[in-house]
Every structure is written in C-alpha cells, then in structure tokens.
C-alpha cells in the first residue's frame, strides 16, 4: 500500500468482497471516506509509514475456504507493521488471534467465568478416535480455525466417528486442530447472537438451528450455493430451507445480564466489533460458544432492527477518524 494519498480515511482490511456490500453502502450513506485493502496477496514495505487513517480488520478464519489461505498471515504482518508505526487499528493484532482460534476463544471466555461447552482439543486427526473414547455422548467435532460451521459434525459414539474418518467423511482442519465438544441441547431449536459495536449493544438475533444447522453465518451470501444459486442445506440442519423462510429473527426486548458481561469481555480482550453466540438449555444454562470478530449482518434483520449494524460501524469509525484527525473534519 502506498502512502502517496495522505488524506485520512477508514482503511478496511478484508478478503471477501461478497461480504462488503452492506458496509460500503453504510460508509457512502454517511459520507465516511474509506478505502478497501484486499489482503489476498501483495507486497508490504516495512520501511514505509502507513497512510493516515483508521484501520479496521475484517479478516475471517474461513478465508482459506475461498482460496485465500495467505490472507491470515498477511494480515498478521500488516497489523504488526501498523502497530509498529502507532496506527490506530480496530479489531487489531490481538483480535485476529482470537478470530483464528476457537481454543483461544473458549479459554478466554472460561477465564472470565462464562459457561462454555465441555471441550477436548485434539492436534492431529489420527488422535481423534482415542480422544473421543470416554467423552460424553453425543458430541460434535469442530475445526479450531474456521467459520460457517466448518468441520461441525454430530456423532453418537467414538465408533461412529472412527467409521466416518475411515470412509473419508471427516474434513481435515486447516491448522490440524480439531475440537471434541459437548453437544449442548437447546431448550428451543435456536441460538442467540449478540451484536456489540464500540462497547454498545446494537441488537440480538436468534437463528433457527432446525433450518440453519451448524452454519449460522448471517450474511446473505452464506445461504446460497455460489454455483447454482440454490438455497443450501446447512450441515446439521433437519429441515430444508425454503424460499421466503427466514432462519434469523430479531430478538426483540432482549435485556439479559449477559450483555454487560459480553461488553466487559470484549473490553478486556481489546475487541471493538463482535457478535457473540450462546445457547439456552432447558435446565437454565447459558452456554457461550463462539465469538465472531468479523461479524456480518443479515439484510432481513436490518430492515426491522432499531439500529443498523453496518450503520453503527460507519458511525463508530467516523468518530474515531474525527478524533484522530480533527483538522480533517
């Protein structure tokens, strides 16, 4: 990236143009100057100072599924460079490590007293079956590094897992790390996702797990087969989604104490934009299981929500830009 253009802007670090549309629209509607930086490949001059502005990272742990396996380490390099020059980042260097590791997420959540699923971390697929022996059943497997339900499968026994691996039906994780995890039974077939931007609660949504399964990405692009344009049957879903049906719904009037606990968690971890997901069980548990730091927003939810997620991000970043560069107002 060249620093020839010195006007301060919001620099958006990302790798998936399919997810950027709502944010582009929000920036343009609010008159916020921005520049996309697609971290797919490129050249980084460590001796050149970064251009003026605020840097917002939206790199996803699922980047490798789009052929962008280099994006993760490229982003780490860019964020190290930005930190070295004192640039202001949003969801910066620490955040990308939490985004890339569910082990990191779960250990940090547990350290702050959240109820998280019983989990066993397995490095090397050849150790999975042995690790599953004696683990409470049913259980799920999950990739440490990923999103969109990557590697999530439900098994009723270690023998069933062994058969799946032998048949070639177990997808190898990108970083070689799998999670064996308690299958948390929800009181209703839904999970809740809490959206927080700049330490403010924006809204909460529910996701229908009967139709959404383990793939609960709110972005509209996640629900469509990119080749055929047909609705996908997500892994773990028990009901085929149909045109006109909505997996996501606004959870109106949500005012749970967990909101303030999530805000405190994000402050402690230095995360400024996130969606955190939890399951409520019939016996009263509130089980937090995922922290999404490159959060997407669903168009149907946005149409009825009291606040816009992308709009709130545009406003938050614009305020940071104005504070950092008052002469540019």
Regions found by a protein language model. Give the residues of each.
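Short hydrophobic segments within beta-strands
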Residues: 12-13, 197
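Extreme N-terminal starter segment of soluble prokaryotic enzymes
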Residues: 5-11
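Conserved N-proximal alpha/beta basic substrate-recognition cap immediately N-terminal to
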Residues: 15-118
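Active-site nucleotide/adenylate-binding loops and adjacent lid/helix of ATP-dependent enzymes
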Residues: 2-4, 84-86, 93-191, 198, ...
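Phosphate-binding site of ATP-dependent enzymes
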Residues: 156-266
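Short glycine-rich anion-binding loops that position phosphate/pyrophosphate groups of nucleotides
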Residues: 60-63, 144-146, 294
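Protein kinase-like catalytic core scaffold
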Residues: 139, 202-203, 274, 287-289
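C-terminal active-site "lid" helix and adjoining low-complexity regulatory extension at the edge
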Residues: 249-253, 266-273, 280-329
